[in-house]
Regions:
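TRNA-recognition modules of translation machinery and tRNA-sensing kinases, especially anticodon-binding
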Residues: 1-114
Length: 114
């Protein structure tokens, strides 16, 4: 078996010298969001598949071709998040974040999997 020495197609490594630039951009974006009244939300990397079927649409390319879905030990269908909005809305509803009135101003910095 050949030693794997290259990142998978479509991915990149963010190495020293580049990571500092990314950190600076993230810090500026975070500061701007918070100065404008947004709060950070962090949601799980995976969600119940039905959440994405209902929010993205069960006949879209995302659902039909671009989601990484598997069954957990309990037989439930779980999907790595292909986007962030559905999980953020689910968390907002589940945790009653809308009780303080509207608008609910949230931001997230996440990895998505397609």
């Amino acid at each position: 078996m050949e030693l794997i020495t290259k990142a998978p197609k479509g991915t990149v490594d963010i190495i020293p010298g580049e990571s500092e630039k990314w950190s600076l951009v993230e810090a500026v974006m975070t500061d701007e969001a918070e100065l404008n009244g947004f709060s950070e939300i962090r949601t799980p990397v995976f969600e119940h598949t039905e959440l994405f079927l209902r929010s993205v649409g069960d006949t879209t390319d995302v659902v039909e071709k671009q989601m990484y879905t598997f069954e957990d030990k309990g037989g439930r269908s779980i999907t790595l998040r292909p986007e962030g909005t559905a999980g953020a809305v689910r968390a907002m509803l589940e945790n009653g974040l809308y009780n303080g009135g509207y608008p609910v101003k949230l931001y997230y910095k996440i990895s998505c999997y397609r």
